[in-house]
Every structure is written in C-alpha cells, then in structure tokens.
C-alpha cells in the first residue's frame, strides 16, 4: 500500500545525526536536561499527518480468513483455561494467579522471587491492583450487553443521568460527518481517551461468537456459567439481543477506537504488582470511557455499542483507525506511547470521517529487534517471520501476523501472580515518541541494517531494564499516573481531530 514519502536523509546528514550536531538532538529526548519541548510538541502533532497511508486497511489477509470466535482466546478456551497454582492444584487460571498473589504478600514479595522492602509494600502493590479493577469488574467489561456495558441506554434512566427527558429518543439534529467527528472526538477526550481514531467497521474483526453469561445470572455467580452467543448483522433499527443472538444493525458503519495510556514507570516494573496495578486502573478507565461516550452518542440521536475488550479484535480496529501498527508481541504500537496503552472501541451508526492508517516503520523494526521475544519469560513470542498460518486454536489464520503461543503466555500469569507485561515494558517504543524524532524513523524504515544499532543503543542506555518498585512508590505521581508531558504529547485541536480523506 502506498504511503506518504518520508523525508530524505543524506549520508552526511546521517553522520551528523550519529556523531555530530544532530546527536545531541537525538539523545536529548532520552532524558538529558534541556530537551527542546517546543520541537517535541511540534513533532508529536505532525506524526499522524507525516505517516498517513492511503485509504484502505494495511492488514494483509488471504482467502483463509474467517471471523474469529471469542471462545478461542486463551482466556476462555477449555485447552488453556485451567492452570496449576504454586501448589500444583489445577484451577481457572485467574484463581491460580490469586493464590500466587497471596503467597507473594505473605512472603514479602512484589513479584515472582522479587523481594519487597517489607510485607507492607508487598501488600500495598496488590491492594492498589485490586482497587484498580473495581469499576471494570462491577461495570461488566467481560461480557457484552451485561451490567453497564449495555447495547442500549434503557436502564440508565434520565433521573440517574440528569438528562432532558426524551433526549435519547429525539432524532439527530446533526448529520454532517465533519461536525459529528469533531464533537465525538472532543467527547472522547473528555471521557478519558489519550488517543482516539475512527475507522469504517470491518466485520472481519467482529467476533463470530461472543462469550457471555445468561442475562439473569449475577456476576458473582458467573463462574462456569459462560455461554457462546453468535454476533450477527441484520436489518434491525437498534442493537438488540435475543435468546439466540447478539444482533448488530446493518447500519452500523463506524468504530471509534480509543487508547488509554498506562503509567510508564509502573509498567517498567513488570512482572511485578505495580505493572498489574496500572493495567487494572486502565481497564476501569476503559469502562468509564465506553459508558460516557456511548451515552453522548445516544443523546445525539444515534446508537452506540460499548465493547472494552469484547465484541471484536481491538488491535485490528486500532490499526485501521490510525492509532498505530501491529507488532511482534501482538499489541498495537503507537507513536506516542508505544504498546503501553489499553484499547477500547465503540460501534455506532453516527456518520463520521474515518482516519487514515499510519506506517512509521514498526513492522520493519520488529522484524529485526526481537527484544520482546528475547525477554519473554514464557518464550511465547515467536522469533520467526509473520505468517498466515496460526500455530494453535488461539490464533487467527488468514491474517499476516506474528503467530504467538498465547497458551504459554497465559501459563506464566499464575506463576507471576499477575498479567506479566514484560514485552510492553522492554519494548523500545514504550519510551514514547522519542523514536520518531530527528530522522530515526527514516533509519528504521529505510536502513534495516541499522535496526540492531538502535536496539544496541537502547540496551546500552539501560532502557528496558526493570524498575525498582520502591523507587516508583517514592517517586512523583501525576493524576491518573500520567507522565508529566502527557497532555502536551497528545493534545488535539479541531483541525487535528477532523481530517478529510
């Protein structure tokens, strides 16, 4: 697929970049005092325009592609759902992980064989993690059209939300895609999105079947009561659920994808409790985001389907919405945060202007880097090339991607007492958009033999090394754990929110 021409960089310019004048600019963003904040802000604003691709999906598929059933994920499939705990007792994987968390607290550990300052610190990390999950668990991230992840706003009464009576039933007053895109992206930022993009709904990435529970089963009684329910598209006016199906209207044409950033320092302690905590808080933020944005869209006269982790494949939607590119580890790597984001999406019939996918060299870089595969504790990440053939039931064949062993990945979670995250922590792009400055993107995309040099510099400077939890607790923390320069790097004005194709 054709993409926008990259800036030219001569051999002489490259020499200056590495050994001369440009070197200071290159190294400065790694933490040297005096880094040019104005230039950094300018570059961040230009990233997506600079790396925009032509219209269409950058995801390569063949005729073997079929919609993927959610039950095939390692989290839910019978072949991977049960894992032994540290005593050898076989349980659902998350219960075995809970046992390990308790063992670590009692032994004064922040993670697997990682001593805490004291038992109090060990407990504090797990307490923060457990608190972080509160909204996610209670608002029903796991199951579609359950609890507060409803496909309609019927149970969210006007009394509860202080909305003018009938606002959600009033026909749309605005149908202009440009105006509506501006409104919805503003609302998305207000609802907590650190990144937001729009894509045309590609049904290939919607699950063929969802994993859910019967509507009359309380969440606390849902264990072992999950059922599979097909997701189908039909000529219906609104999203509905029957006894047999979850039905998305054929008029559902757009998906809004949001990235919710995690705290970098906390994630870089992985696989420790603090990495689990920033993950947990992001999942709860995802739930709140979906609830708020869906209600805004409904009050504008359109329908909206929340999803968080469910309904479809978040990474594929994020790639097509221009948030980033798919990576070797399987996550979406964004220019601003690397893979250190969680993704959620909202499906709607609201007319919107789609964003263009971007290409800033992630595929070429991942082909050579392999740092996530090298550091993966379970060796679940492949060091081989991308293929169309899945390696197990958990992979989707027919899509060109790195095919990883997600059963191995999940198997390490009970051992570590958490959700690992080592691949995200060690990824060079997790440091943020410094890898997009001063010609580095040109080197990655055009000079593949230099990729090992970039990785070597990354290792030599100590990036990707595990952070100490005590230092993180004693360090500075901003609201929601966001980095100090967070909003400068993600600011979006109207002219940036709406780009006509």
Swiss-Prot record:
Statement: the UniProt record of this protein carries the keyword Transferase: no
Subcellular location: Cytoplasm; Cell inner membrane
PROSITE patterns named among the record's database cross-references: 4FE4S_FER_1 (PS00198), 4FE4S_FER_2 (PS51379), TAT (PS51318)
Residue span(s) of domain 4Fe-4S ferredoxin-type: 356-386, 420-439
One Gene Ontology molecular-function label: metal ion binding
UniProt-annotated binding residues for corrinoid: 74, 207, 309-314, 329-332, 341-343, 394-401, 419
Post-translation changes: Predicted to be exported by the Tat system. The position of the signal peptide cleavage has not been experimentally proven.
Protein name, UniProt field: Tetrachloroethene reductive dehalogenase
Gene: pceA
